[in-house]
C-alpha cells in the first residue's frame, strides 16, 4: 500500500493531486477533510481526526473500502478491526458522544453554508489573500513553490528574525493568536481551517 498526507501542517506543504498508483491508497486527511469536495472512491482508506474541521479531538472519521476491510487480520482484538466497527454501526464500544453531537452540528453548518464547494472557494480565497500579501511584502517570505503551498496552513518567515517577538506581540494585541510556527521549523504559521473567518 501507499500512505500519504495531502497536507503537511508544520511546513505548509500540500499535494493537490491524488496519486494514481496500482497499490491500495491510504491517506491521513485530518487537516483537509471537509475543506473541499473529495472523490473517496479513489482511496482504499481515509482517516481523519476531527480536531481541525469537524469538532473536538477524540473523534476519528474512517472511510474504508469493503475490499480492504474484508482483508483485516481476524486474530486482532475486535476493537482493532474496522469490520467489527462497521458491523456494529460504529457502536462497538461507547462512542465519544459529545464529539459526535458536536460533529453533527458542524456537518449541518457546512451544509447550510453552501457545502464543500463553498468551503473550497472560501479557503482558496483566504489562502490567496495571505500568500499575495506575503509575496508582495518586503517584511515576510514564503519559500515554498506555489504549486506545493497549503491552502490550510500558510507558513511564512519574517526576513529579519529579530522582529519575531514584536510581530507575535502586535499580532496578539490585534486578536491574531497562535501564529508562532511549529517548534521544529520556527517561523510563523496561520492555520485557516473552515471555521476561520475571511
Regions found by a protein language model. Give the residues of each.
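Short acidic/polar capping segments at secondary-structure boundaries
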Residues: 6-11, 30-33, 38, 51-54, ...
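Conserved PLP-binding catalytic core of the aspartate aminotransferase-like
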Residues: 140-171
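Conserved active-site segment immediately N-terminal to the catalytic lysine
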Residues: 26, 40-51
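Conserved PLP-binding active-site segment of the aspartate aminotransferase-like
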Residues: 154-160, 176-198
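Active-site phosphate-binding strand-loop segment of PLP-dependent enzymes
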Residues: 1-33
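Active-site C-terminal subdomain of aminotransferase-like
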Residues: 50-131, 145
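Solvent-exposed alpha-helices and their adjacent loops that cap or buttress functional pockets
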Residues: 17-20, 37-41, 52-56, 146-147, ...
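Conserved hydrophobic/aromatic beta-strand scaffold that supports enzyme active sites
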Residues: 1, 45, 59-63, 153-155
Amino acid at each position: 500500500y501507499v500512505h500519504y498526507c495531502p497536507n503537511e501542517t508544520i511546513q505548509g506543504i500540500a499535494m493537490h493531486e491524488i496519486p494514481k498508483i496500482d497499490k491500495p491508497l491510504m491517506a491521513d486527511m485530518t487537516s483537509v477533510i471537509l475543506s473541499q469536495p473529495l472523490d473517496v472512491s479513489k482511496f482504499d482508506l481515509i482517516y481523519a481526526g476531527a480536531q481541525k474541521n469537524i469538532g473536538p479531538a477524540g473523534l476519528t472519521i474512517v472511510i474504508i473500502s469493503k475490499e480492504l476491510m474484508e482483508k483485516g487480520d481476524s486474530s486482532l482484538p475486535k476493537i482493532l478491526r474496522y469490520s467489527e466497527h462497521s458491523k456494529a454501526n460504529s457502536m462497538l464500544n461507547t462512542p465519544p458522544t459529545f464529539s459526535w453531537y458536536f460533529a453533527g452540528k458542524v456537518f449541518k453548518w457546512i451544509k447550510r453554508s453552501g457545502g464543500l464547494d463553498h468551503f473550497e472557494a472560501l479557503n482558496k480565497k483566504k489562502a490567496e489573500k495571505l500568500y499575495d500579501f506575503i509575496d508582495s511584502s518586503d517584511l515576510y517570505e514564503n519559500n515554498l513553490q506555489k504549486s506545493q503551498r497549503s491552502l490550510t496552513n500558510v507558513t511564512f518567515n519574517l526576513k529579519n528574525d529579530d522582529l519575531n517577538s514584536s510581530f507575535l506581540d502586535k499580532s496578539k494585541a490585534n486578536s491574531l493568536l497562535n501564529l508562532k510556527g511549529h517548534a521544529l521549523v520556527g517561523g510563523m504559521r496561520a492555520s485557516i481551517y473552515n471555521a476561520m473567518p475571511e
